[in-house]
């Protein structure tokens, strides 16, 4: 018998390695780290991505350069001279230290970071002409990317909301872009600065004229993108104005590192989110919370003129409105009045008495059994017939009193 044909094995699709402006091995030490940790790092846009290896597709950390302040060369602790392999990246709220293998690698990292942050090729670094050409190409790519990208300090808020954001989060910046209030295809710039102990809030108008943005000041200035508008305000105020950037250093997708069984490499795995459970039934009874020791007391009656939805306990019957009826005591059994009772028989038949259980025979004898045709529903005791007759007499007396 021929074995069943199996479909051909499809090779597992491999992800595409991310592209970066510049990438190399980089050792990083954050404010809370005790020692340096080695990563494969890549610069793309205004973000540095960190990977466990140069063959990983998913980053494990990232660092936003939106709050960039400056770069400085770092001399290792206990060393009398600069080995040319340490530098520090100072942001608005933290300082990160880096360590590379060579002086050339350090200058390359500093040059590419300054290129994307300041949108210019630095000229005060120890770089070769080929390095400067690479940075000029990155500058053109970054300018094209920002022309199509909305700055991070642009928020869809009103004028009042912009003022409140700058007031509530002063550590996040003091310059914010927002849609124009006149409904035109332009933007407005809101700033908040301290002057003589008083916070001063100012608003600037930016008009849209074709593909360009014109800043409406004494000498109108034309910009090719919104990012250029932000750079104009930052550069013309000697960096006194800082773009507003809320802290968003938290990931939205859960992931973990797992070793690939085929090649042994570490890969980043993002498990699929579990689907939502069944929706609770709105029309059904509400679940009862576990009762405490104080809930064992009988519930109090509801207050008048209050509309509350609550669940009636099982042991409590609904209130009954009685109209021209005798209310029976709770200690006596309540007999419901039927609409029409049949005439009682002249004499109640005596209920048959059930047979006694047959004695067990241990010596092999057989006990006698009743015929099957004589099996009838039996009363448990003979006293139940007397109680039925007594209730019947009471019912006849009540009917006589009513008539």
From Swiss-Prot:
Residues 343-356 have a biased composition (Pro residues). It comes from the Eukaryota. Keywords: Coiled coil, Cytoplasm, Phosphoprotein, SH2 domain. It is found in: Cytoplasm. The modification Phosphotyrosine is found at residues 22, 250, 310, 322. Gene3D superfamilies: Pleckstrin-homology domain (PH domain)/Phosphotyrosine-binding domain (PTB), SH2 domain. Phosphorylated on tyrosine. Tyr-250 may be important for interaction with kinases. Phosphorylated by PTK6 at Tyr-250 modulates PTK6-mediated STAT3 activation. Tyr-22 and Tyr-322 appears to be phosphorylated by SRC. Transmembrane segments: none annotated. Residues 270-308, 331-374 are annotated as: Disordered. Residues 133-248 form the SH2 domain. Residues 382-402 form a coiled coil. One of its GO terms (cellular component) is plasma membrane. GO terms for molecular function: signaling adaptor activity. Widely expressed. Residues 18-130 form the PH domain. Interacts with PTK6 and CSF1R. Substrate of protein kinase PTK6. May play a regulatory role in the acute-phase response in systemic inflammation and may modulate STAT3 activity. This is Signal-transducing adaptor protein 2. It comes from Homo sapiens (Human). The gene is STAP2.
């Amino acid at each position: 018998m021929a074995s069943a044909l199996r479909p051909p094995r499809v090779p597992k699709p491999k992800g595409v390695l991310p592209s970066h402006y510049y990438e190399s091995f980089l050792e990083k030490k954050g404010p809370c780290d005790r020692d340096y940790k080695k990563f494969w790092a890549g610069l793309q846009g205004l973000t540095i991505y960190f990977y466990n290896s140069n063959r990983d597709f998913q980053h494990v950390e990232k660092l936003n350069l939106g709050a960039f302040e400056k770069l400085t060369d770092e001399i290792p602790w206990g060393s009398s001279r600069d080995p040319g392999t340490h530098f520090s990246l100072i942001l608005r709220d933290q300082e990160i230290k880096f360590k590379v293998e060579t002086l050339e690698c350090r200058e390359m990292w500093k040059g590419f970071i300054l290129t994307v942050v300041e949108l210019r090729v630095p000229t005060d670094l120890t770089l070769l002409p080929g390095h400067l050409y690479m940075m000029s190409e990155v500058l053109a790519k970054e300018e094209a990317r920002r022309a199509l990208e909305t700055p991070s300090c642009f928020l869809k808020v009103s004028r009042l909301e912009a003022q409140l954001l700058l007031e509530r989060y002063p550590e996040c910046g003091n310059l914010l872009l927002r849609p124009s209030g006149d409904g035109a295809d332009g933007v407005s710039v809101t700033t908040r600065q301290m002057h003589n102990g008083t916070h001063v809030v100012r608003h600037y108008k930016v008009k849209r004229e074709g593909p360009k943005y014109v800043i409406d000041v004494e000498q109108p200035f034309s910009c090719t993108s919104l990012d250029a508008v932000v750079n104009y305000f930052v550069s013309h105020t000697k960096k006194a104005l800082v773009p507003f950037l809320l802290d968003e250093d938290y990931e939205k997708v859960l992931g973990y590192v797992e070793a690939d069984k085929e090649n042994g490499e570490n890969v980043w795995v993002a498990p699929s989110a579990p689907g939502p459970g069944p929706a609770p039934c709105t029309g059904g009874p509400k679940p009862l919370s576990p009762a405490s020791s104080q809930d064992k007391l009988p519930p109090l009656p509801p207050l008048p003129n209050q509309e509350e939805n609550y669940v009636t306990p099982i042991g409590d019957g609904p209130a009954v409105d009685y109209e021209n009826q005798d209310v029976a005591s709770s200690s006596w059994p309540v007999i419901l009045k039927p609409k029409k009772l049949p005439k009682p028989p002249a004499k109640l038949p005596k209920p048959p008495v059930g047979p006694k259980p047959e004695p067990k025979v241990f010596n092999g004898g057989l006990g006698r059994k009743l015929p099957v045709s004589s099996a009838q529903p039996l009363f448990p005791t003979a006293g139940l017939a007397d109680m039925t007759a007594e209730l019947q007499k009471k019912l006849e007396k009540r009917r006589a009193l009513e008539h």
